[in-house]
Regions:
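RecB-family 4Fe-4S metal-dependent nuclease core
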Residues: 1-153
Length: 153
């Protein structure tokens, strides 16, 4: 669990601080020296446009590891006193492996993204955004008011 401060993102202030439970599955965690390197295995083809989203995903995993209890870490075979120093991802179809040091900007970005999601939740602001690859397969499509607009069809 982490605390998202009401002022995490000044552009999207929250009404109060929130305790957020993080949950996810990390594909692999490697130990290198005195630190850990989580690795994500991905399907699909690598493209450079995926760099920023991958960094955010890995920053989420770093938050998850570093805010887990000692018992949870030990159960997963991890030493509680070691930090995540790097992160990595692997796209087998493209034979692409990337490893880099943790980026502070990515850590800040993922916290702000969580704050923005809470901000939207508090205000019930979830505007529909059409994307042809996903909207057509959404189970909500048939009753989505925005999906029925003439400009989408």
């Amino acid at each position: 669990e982490i605390i998202i401060d009401a002022n995490t993102d000044p552009k999207y202030p929250l009404r109060r601080d929130y305790k957020v439970h993080l949950q996810g599955i990390i594909d692999r965690v490697f130990r290198e020296g005195d630190g850990y390197i989580p690795m994500e295995f991905k399907t699909g083809k690598w493209s450079d446009s995926k760099m920023s989203p991958m960094r955010k995903e890995m920053a989420f995993y770093k938050l998850m590891i570093e805010n887990s209890s000692e018992a949870v870490l030990r159960q997963a075979g991890l030493e509680p006193n070691l930090d995540v120093t790097h992160w990595s991802w692997y796209y087998p179809i493209s034979n692409f492996i990337h490893v880099e040091k943790v980026k502070k900007t990515s850590m800040t970005s993922v916290l702000k993204s969580i704050a923005r999601l809470i901000h939207a939740y508090e205000r019930k602001l979830f505007p529909a955004k059409f994307f042809y690859k996903t909207c057509a397969h959404c189970s909500y499509f048939g009753i989505c008011e925005a999906a029925q607009e003439d400009t989408w069809l």
